[in-house]
Amino acid sequence: MIKNYEIFKANDLSILDLFKLSIQKTIKKKYKKFNGDLSQIHKFIKKKNINQIRLDAFNNLNNNLDWMKLLKKICLDNLVKKLGPDIMVQTKLNLSIQIPNDETSVLDMHSDCWSADSPFQLNVWIPMTNAFSSNSMFIIDSNKSLKYFKELSKSGKNQKLIKPKVTDFVNVNYGKYLIFNPSLLHGNIKNKTSHTRVSLNIRFKSYFSPEPSLRNSDRKFGTYYKNFNLTDNTKFGINYIKTGLIT
């Protein structure tokens, strides 16, 4: 049975600081009084403006930062251990901001497979602030998740959602990151702490994992995924196929 999740220390904290600095600069550009503490964003930005600043920071991260190169320095070694050396990555780096008492940022319990994602992928979740208690996310263990999926498959109806326990919430401080299979049931609740949680997340899967079916054709290589790390042998094989000798 797979581990529910694993937490790792970032290989180089200065790399994480580059992601953090990018977000801070985006906020500071629009909100001059912002003091740089991402966990206190809610004291400087109104709730109605949070999503727009998230989108601005998202665009800045994806367009102006060599994030793939940076991620390789942070977590490639652990991804290779889990997926092998030939890896694809989601085309965009995702950014989440969950301020205290904001119900609009609640993401109910779900499996990413329900929105047609691959069950073979892994999610790397990188908090830009300390993530704890209700400002973090919960992950339901693999045994309970699979039991729920089997019951759902048999009945064909929505099952009663599993209520997360306190122990289901992950505690990950800045400087560390978490790897989990997002097919597991997971989500978040209203942030009842006094701290905002800011986090990055992105999906990875093996280059040799099954390609999407018609059900999830938009999750295929070239649209949803791109190459992240390939061995020389795999690169040669790809180039051989491109010659047209293999149909």
Named regions from a protein language model:
Residues 1-83, 243-247:
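N-terminal auxiliary "cap/dimerization" subdomain that precedes the catalytic jelly-roll/cupin core
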Residues 60-72, 123, 142-150, 205-208:
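Short N-terminal helix-initiation segments at or just after the protein's N-terminus
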Residues 69, 97-101, 108:
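Active-site periphery "cap/insert" segments of enzyme catalytic domains
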Residues 85-94:
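A short coil-to-beta-strand element that immediately follows conserved catalytic motifs
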Residues 92, 121-125, 197-199:
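Broad gene-expression machinery/nucleic-acid interaction feature
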Residues 95-102, 113-114, 130-131, 144-145, ...:
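Short, solvent-exposed loop/turn segments at secondary-structure junctions
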Residues 144-247:
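Conserved double-stranded beta-helix
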